[in-house]
Amino acid sequence: MKIAIGCDHIVTDTKMEVSQHLKAQGHEVIDVGTYDFTRTHYPIFGKKVGEKVASGEADLGVCICGTGVGISNAANKVPGVRTALVRDMTSALYSKEELNANVVSFGGKVAGELFIFDIVDAFIKAEYKPTEENKKLIAKINHLEAHNDNQANPHFFDEFLEKWDKGKYHD
C-alpha cells in the first residue's frame, strides 16, 4: 500500500520512526516532509499529505504534529480527504470502518511511538463497512466541500515561508 506521511518540525523524529515502521511492514512511503527540525508550520504538510491521498498517489495518509489538531485540520481542508485525529484504537477503527477516513492524524507529543505504530497498523488493516446510513452521511460531508482557488495555489504559504527565511519565527 502507498502511504503519504507528513509532519511539522516538532515531531520529525516520530515521523521518521513511523515511516521506518511502515516500510518494515512492506508499505511504500511517500514522505512529504518536513525532514529536519528547522521551524516550519503544520498546514503545509497536512495539505501535502491530503493532496497525495485525494489525487490517488497515496492510498492513505498519516499526519503528525505536536498535538495532531492543527495538521488534521489542514489535511481536512483538501477536498476528498477525511482525516481522523485519533488518540485511541476505538476512534481509529471507527473512523475507517464507519466514516471511510483516508488520513489518520496524531499528536506526536501526546501519543507514544509504539502506540502510534499499533493504531496505524490497525487503521491500515481496517476496512470501510458501507451502510446506507453512513454512505448518506459521508455524502453530506462531501457536499460541504467547496472548491477554493487557494487549494491549488502552490504559493499559498509563501508569505509565511518568507518570514521563516528572514528568521522572524523563534521557538
Curated annotation (Swiss-Prot):
Pathway involvement of the protein, from the record: Carbohydrate metabolism; D-galactose 6-phosphate degradation; D-tagatose 6-phosphate from D-galactose 6-phosphate: step 1/1
Protein family according to the UniProt entry: Belongs to the LacAB/RpiB family.
Encoding gene per record: lacB
HAMAP family the record matches: LacB
Reactions performed catalytically: aldehydo-D-galactose 6-phosphate = keto-D-tagatose 6-phosphate
Organism: Staphylococcus haemolyticus (strain JCSC1435)
One record GO biological process: lactose catabolic process via tagatose-6-phosphate
Keyword terms, alphabetized: Isomerase, Lactose metabolism
Subunit structure: Heteromultimeric protein consisting of LacA and LacB.
Identification of the protein by name: Galactose-6-phosphate isomerase subunit LacB
Superkingdom assignment: Bacteria
UniProt entry tagged with the keyword Ion transport: no
Xref: NCBIfam families: lacB, PRK05571.1, PRK08622.1, rpiB_lacA_lacB
GO terms, molecular function: galactose-6-phosphate isomerase activity; ribose-5-phosphate isomerase activity
Residue intervals passing through the bilayer: none
Annotated EC: 5.3.1.26
